[in-house]
Amino acid sequence: MSISVSSQRVAVSNLYTNGSEESVKAIKELKSKRLLETETRLDGLFDYYIPDTLREILTGYGMEFSVHSFQGHAHPVSKMIENHMLYRVAPNYFSSNTLVVSCKESKIKRLRLKNANNRNLNFTQYNRLVHANHHHRYENAFRELDVGNLTNLINKEDQSECIFIHDEVQYWSLDEMQRFLGSLSKVDRVVYSIIYPSEVEAGYSQSLFPEAYTFDLKDRRLVWYPDGKAEGAYTQPVNPWLLRCSKTEDSKGRSWTITKLQTIGAHHLFSAIKGSYLTEESYKYDNFTIINPNDVLKGKRGGKPLYLRARMIKPTLLYLLALKKSDSNSAVAKLRMLSSREENMDEALFVAQLAKQIKDTALYDKMGNPNLRSILSESFYDIAGSLFTRLFNRPEYDARCLEKFIRSCETTEIHVERRYMEGIRRGASFKVQNVMDWVEDDSANALSEVNFLDISWNDRVSEPYGIECIHGEGSRIRVPLSRILRAHELIAGVQTDVEINFPRYVCSSRALIHFRQYLIKLGRFSFMESRAIKDIEDIQAGLEEGVITEEEAELRLLPTTKPKITEIHMDDDTPGTSGESDVEKFKSVRSLCREEIYSEKLKGREVAFYSRHSKEYKYNGGSHRSLGWDEALNELTQELGLDDSYDHCLIQRYTAGGSIGFHADDEPCYLPGGSVVTVNLHGDATFEVKENQSGKIEKKELHDGDVYVMGPGMQQTHKHRVTSHTDGRCSITLRNKTVDYEARKGDEDSEYEEDKAELDEGIDYLQKNQGNMCSLKAFADHMQLSTPSVIAIVNGASPQTLREIEDGGYSLATLVNLSKALDFPIAIHGERGYAETPGSYRRLHLKITSGHVEPFEGVTSKGGFREAMLLGDGVGVGHFRVDKAKADRLAQSFYNGNTGVLLGKYNKGKMHTGEIEEPKEVLTAFGFAGSGKSHWCQTILKHCSVEKVLVISPRKVLRDDWVAKISKKHRVVTFEVAFMDDYGCKDIVIDEIGLLPPGYIDLVIAAHQPRTLVLLGDPLQSTYHSKRDNVVLEASQEDVFNRVRGKLPYLCYSHRLPRNCKLFEIECMGAESEKRVVYRSNRLKDEPTICATRAMKEEKGSGWYTVSETQGLSFKSCLIYLDEHWAKKEDEDVMVALTRSRGEIGIHVTPALKKKLITNAKSTLLKKVLKGETYRRSEIVAMVRKHIPETTVLFEESRLAETVDYEARLAGDPYLKSLLALYDEIEMEDIEIEEPVTLEPTKTHLALSTKMNELAPFDLKAKEHREQHTEAGRTEQIDENGYQGEVGDPMTHKALYLRHTSDDTATFMMSVKKRLRFRNYEANRRKYKTCHGIGHQMFSVFKDTYQLKEIDSLPELERCEMEFMKKRIEKSTGLIEKHAGRSDPDWPSNYLKIFLKQQTCTKMEKRGVDAKAGQTIACFAHSVLCRFGPILRQTEKALRELLPEKLMIYSQKKYMDLDKWAKTWVESMMGTDSDYEAFDRSQDEKVLDLEVEVLRFFLWPEDLIREYEELKLMMGCALGDLAVMRFSGEFGTFFFNTVCNMVFSCMRYHIDRNTPMCFAGDDMYSPGILRVKKDYEATLDQLTLKAKVHISEEPLFCGWRMSPFGIIKEPNLILDRWKIALRSGNLSLCLVNYAIEASFGYRLSEHLYDVNIDVDAQQELVREIVIKKHLLPKKISDLFSEDECERHSDGDEDFLSNDVARLYRIE
């Protein structure tokens, strides 16, 4: 926390406030007098306004400031530094008689005044005219230019003991200074101030303290800008001697010692003392705010050095290091928060790049003893240098640079060496000026001397020159003039004409061979061959240029072997015929070729592509989807003797005459040097090969069974073509050396695959994920290997596993995939199911409990497809009741050709249905688009040992996707083909059930009677529609999801949508997209476009889809073409369109149409997207529950890990993460005690309502008479506009209630005036001290009333910390990140932000009232909440344990608890409740004294109690310091409010331990009549807290009417809110809550008349709920239909149709 009880201010304040009144008064007088003296002495010198940050910096240099800094100045910082040096520092070094040089008369006058009381200082003045402006500055100045001969100054020297020169010496050269000192005869001490940036001597070209000054260097001139402003700037020469001279001689040969007295910024105070004394050899200058530019990381644009302020960069750097994943946006946002109108674009660009480098650099490493390898590696890189490290190990170089910058991220320090500078010899024939020292090197040769002369000629400006010190003066120096001239001649002789762009090779020709083909590392275990330079085309030229060796030239000119072309005849039969032996050869693949495997049809041929790993095969002009890898191809490669590297197979079936022109199989997916094997079956063909260089063509005739091999490298040197002579001839082409499929780019992924995040492959980085690798540890133990070894193996076999481990744990499907990749058999035992995978190793049994995997000695179980499916957490168990009528109706539609195209009267299929009485158990996997609802099922069917399964898909394209992802032993068919055969499958999977015709599931169950039926789909997407059978199947129309009964899970997250997707408030895990929604009119090349109608699709042609056609597909990007037809689309259709793209979604819409759709569109989702709003999580849940009432929505993917990853939830708020105690939760079993419950059957008669509630808005006053007019303007609390999309209406239920919004300034100021009180800290402390002791007496009354005993133990604090932590992070990740600013450590703990609570004041007594003040909300820093939150929870628990059963604290409890309490303890309608006035504001220092007593009773540590006291006394906000009061939103608000309420009630009423009472904050209720007590009237009168005693037959508690029959909410309130939500379009978000509240009144039945409730409003409300009952969860809807014999509403006999009644009736 920013304020500590141990701080100096608090410690002194404690002593101060505990003193006697006389001592406190004396201290005040003493300090006030001292302050007055200081302000008087410094008046006018330090009154200029500067930011607090600069004030803090300058205070550290000893500067004082006025308490009222109100004056303005063009350059206030420089002005106050000058004043400090002139008036505060310099006088300390003056003598009694001081001669002041170059200082205005006004300043000397002020010097006399400011120092009149300190010493008797006499000042003599001397000014000279040099610059033109001196005529305006000085009054009696002299025109003397020669510093060494200032006659008038020398005349005044006799009267002085010291000379002070003000800001002039910086213009003097050393010679001038020496001559000036030589002119002095009496004075032996000169004090002088200068302005000279020390950065100049360190070689910097810009200021390192830019807040105080900046400068420019131009032609050895320095232009100095005070405060960086041109106003007041001046030019001076660059004089190195100013800071570097320690001693010198004057013109008379006398020694002078120069010493620095003080430095602030560029202002220095020096003294020159006659004589030679000890002085410093160097001075350190560190009063800068800029990080050393030489230590700053250089970016790609690092041309100039960056000058970055440390106070901005250091907090931002620490913030980025705290983030789990630093990003540029967060970095710039943090910098913006710190800068506060001092923005610097260089800093913004730097932190943005810094964030990216931190994210990309493996900065953190293990600590501990280094191993030998790391020591040698570090030593090697240290010796080799940074350039070598950068070339050969860029990650190491980046990490070193970043670590170096972090370590050196401090303000700059400059060390200036000082030396003796001798005097100038009078009468010398040369002038010493700016000549670099050159020391003769005896070993220097002629060329080096020439080089020196060149440097001198090029770099020096023609000036008078000499040398400062001549070594060996008087001796002769031999100059090798002839050698120098000869060297010039040699250099000129070898110069040749410049050649541009001519390649030069700097290595031997033999070494050059390796640059033509080398390996590139793709991953930890994968490499690919590549070329750095192109191959040699002209051998003779290459030989002459030395590019190739003679041996290589001979090999190229006279090759011993050509690229291998092998022709293999598999038999000796006549060409064109097929013998018996041919049939035996390649038998399996021959059968495969005859099947309907060909997925695409091209000109003259059909194509089928197979691969072991790749999803797709692309080439110029087309691409083919992989069909997996058939077992027949394995047999083919074995017959041909090929290894597993041949992983691509292209099967083509030709027509007679079909051909392909000359081409080479050199697609990017194949590496150079691979072989191509072609098998010719079922016919003859001509195969021609052409050499690229010579054009020579070789022709081969292929017959049935021939195999043709093109050897390595042939695709780079030859081309080939083929012509088929036989209809049905098949060509099978096998390829190897494909690019590693793990390294393929994202745009080559299957459109059905979800994007995966890239993996940091460093194993060291994965060590911190040990908690997520429980199964890998089990693998390691089982294989008897170390965990790092297993990680390395897994990284090579299944990188996806490590990606998921890094993300917090891997899924169950990934565990199965890993088992298959390692050929490692496992048996998985779960709480609901069992599955096993085949393999060649000893089987490992794994037990999964609560997301944790551990090995155990298990035995193989008998589990099938159902048991394997039940292992998945996203799989639910439901029941489906077959409707034989719907099944028969659909079968007849198939038979008549109305539905589908394959089945009909001539192909009836197997659609015989039988009677099925009992509901059929079904397994479900329902989820959001991209949630992976089919992934677990596909994993089982691909890798697990299960019987043959039939998969039914509604469309062919979805069928092809299933075929590619599951084992070939299973059958995948479209929805019609499913009835054309038996298939022999006992288990059936139906995909995308929403796209199937109504009655389809009924027909499948009736016809196939499966053992296990699995249903997959998404209720949020489109449903089946066809014009051909729309009328025929109209009677069967249904919501198929609603027919599946049971508590079914729904996966509400997406692997498809990008991580930065803001359309939906769910977790999205796809690859980030630069932009998610873009409004554009242009369609990208080949981009899929989604339109509303089939007519538009047919008009536009290829690449256009209707919404329903895209369901189940995904695209890299897509365009949604909006027209007027989208206004009629449902939310489900819009959901499909918005979830098809993994990247960008383009929306084509005109501005006029967009505005129209926002107003009139039927889809709420479409409206929100067009308005740029997010579809909230609650809206998604409501949409799901409309179709699946009892669903359990899962917002996070189930992971196999040892612990819950709370850190991932807090990733967006790293500071909050550091404040919370992240405990591993220990599940404790709650002991359930069954209590006897007497059921009360209710028979409710729904009478007709007169709907009097509708008349309420018609009695309202006009808006202008209800609003308040304040100094801040008129309030805006009454809504007379009505509802969006409707005509303005001032008489709606909205207008009944006041609406407080954050943009209503007038209401906010009214609320501040009413709710807040302001007082400074000292006043709060005094008032708190005066009332000390009253809290102890009040709490004693409370303890006596409830007979509280002293406690010696408290509930477990760790448990309370866990509950507090879970409460803080139960919010969505996005919301936590949004409030991350409250976790900023720079937020002071005693500072809070005040907001107006946005709410609609729906209370019965507030209907139709005039505008009133709202409720203020206080926003505290998270440091305060986390400091006190857990211990306050512990205290509240302890209080509850001490209170009797009859006393209820209604907090975080269900309505049923309050209802149960009322039925137990309330005996009559009469009750007592208290109505407090300004409850929060009234909790002043007296209540604080009470709170301290309560905290001591509950054993709070004294230091924590003192900290709580200080925080309450020191509260402040932007409006000022606050008095002691309670704030809504404060830590412990509910607890302290409740305690205060209870203590007040104990003093106000005659009550005891057995009096039943309810408390909740400022609400209190007790059955019956409480007698008012007068015993403590005097004490209560002292309190600001006042209460009105309210006794009535209609008592209220927390908005509930209390009665012996239970609780009931005022029905008019619920009905008003219902109608507002209904017409606002938000009813789905609050429907459940309104129904629950209304159910308590509904269950009272005839007792409603006893409670005296508005029965007419209650009946209207219940009728509204019953109409919407089908949208409620089953448990809630059951509250309104408990009785089987419930009667229909009067006048509404037709409300429940037979179908609806049967659908919702409780079985």
Swiss-Prot record:
RdRp catalytic domain segment(s): 1469-1580
Protein name: RNA replication protein
Family matches, as InterPro entries: (+)RNA_virus_helicase_core_dom, AlkB-like, AlkB-like_sf, Alphavirus-like_MT_dom, DNA/RNA_pol_sf, Oxoglu/Fe-dep_dioxygenase_dom, P-loop_NTPase, RNA-dep_RNA_pol_alsuvir
Domain Alphavirus-like MT: 66-242
Record domain (+)RNA virus helicase C-terminal: where: 1052-1182
Residues holding Fe cation: 663, 665, 720
Cofactor note: Binds 1 Fe(2+) ion per subunit.
